[in-house]
Amino acid sequence: MKLAQKEHKNIYLFIGADKCHFCKMFKEKTLSKKWVMKRLKEHYEVLYLSRDRHYVPKKFEKFGVPRHYFLDANGKIIFQSFGLLEPSGFFTMLDEADLNSND
């Protein structure tokens, strides 16, 4: 969060699991696209946590992955979503998160 504060960016937190088929598909179909990551990194610090390998704070421990959280630089949730998203659906979610962050 310190980096996000320093860079004046919000945070995109993707929580997945190593053996999650839909998490792998999201990475392959959406996050692997350079134009998706370009837009994401313009406004967000990007973090990935695997429930299998990383500590996941309690406020993000919800059933099911992939989980998508958009946080302000202080860690407050401004938007959240669940599931596999194609690039167009992910962009819609980014638009919604951007709108919520301006409230």
What do the predicted segments below correspond to?
Residues 1-32:
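Local sequence-structure signature of Cys/Sec-based thiol-disulfide redox active-site neighborhoods
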Residues 7-11, 42-47, 73-76:
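Loop/turn elements at helix/coil->beta-strand transitions in domains of secreted/extracellular proteins
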Residues 15, 31-54:
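Thiol-based oxidoreductase modules, predominantly thioredoxin-like and allied folds used
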Residues 18-21, 29-30, 51-55, 75-77, ...:
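Solvent-exposed loop/turn segments at secondary-structure junctions
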Residues 22, 35, 89-93:
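Extracytoplasmic/secreted proteins, especially bacterial periplasmic and envelope-associated proteins
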Residues 56-61:
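Short amphipathic alpha-helix with an adjacent loop that forms part of the alpha/beta core around
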Residues 63-103:
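Non-catalytic, surface beta->alpha helical segment in thiol-disulfide oxidoreductase systems
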